[in-house]
Amino acid sequence: MYKDVDSHQRDSRSDGHQDGFKKNPNFRFFKKKTCKFCDMDRVPDYKEFDFLKKFITEQGKILPRRITGTSAKHQRRLALEIKKARYMALLPFVKQ
């Protein structure tokens, strides 16, 4: 049923790599981001507007969690607290 093929013929590929994968020189290893709120055991609060400034862009937009590394639970809470701080005029809606 199966042909008897020696291991050298099975492992050799046409591209010259034994494992069959081409090496990508542009590949970069990214460190997984961790949630700052989970690490420090703190909850986002609108009164800490200096800390909340780290999570908004220069234009005043809320940064997504794939960039900040926050968990889904804390990202939802963070968005609410930023909106509260904007309403209380602690953070600007739009930066000029």
UniProtKB/Swiss-Prot annotation:
Stored InterPro entries: Ribosomal_bS18 (IPR001648), Ribosomal_bS18_CS (IPR018275), Ribosomal_bS18_sf (IPR036870)
Record keywords, A-Z: Ribonucleoprotein, Ribosomal protein, RNA-binding, rRNA-binding
GO function term, MF aspect, one: structural constituent of ribosome
Signal peptide coordinates: none
Composition bias type Basic and acidic residues, residue spans: 1-22
Keyword Ribonucleoprotein: yes
Region feature (Disordered): 1-25
Pfam family name, one: Ribosomal_S18
One Gene Ontology term, aspect cellular component: cytosolic small ribosomal subunit
GO biological process, alphabetically ordered: translation
Its job: Binds as a heterodimer with protein bS6 to the central domain of the 16S rRNA, where it helps stabilize the platform of the 30S subunit.
Oligomeric and partner information: Part of the 30S ribosomal subunit. Forms a tight heterodimer with protein bS6.
Family, similarity comment: Belongs to the bacterial ribosomal protein bS18 family.
Protein name: Small ribosomal subunit protein bS18
Lineage, top ranks: Bacteria, Pseudomonadati, Spirochaetota, Spirochaetia, Spirochaetales
Name of the gene encoding the protein in the UniProt record: rpsR
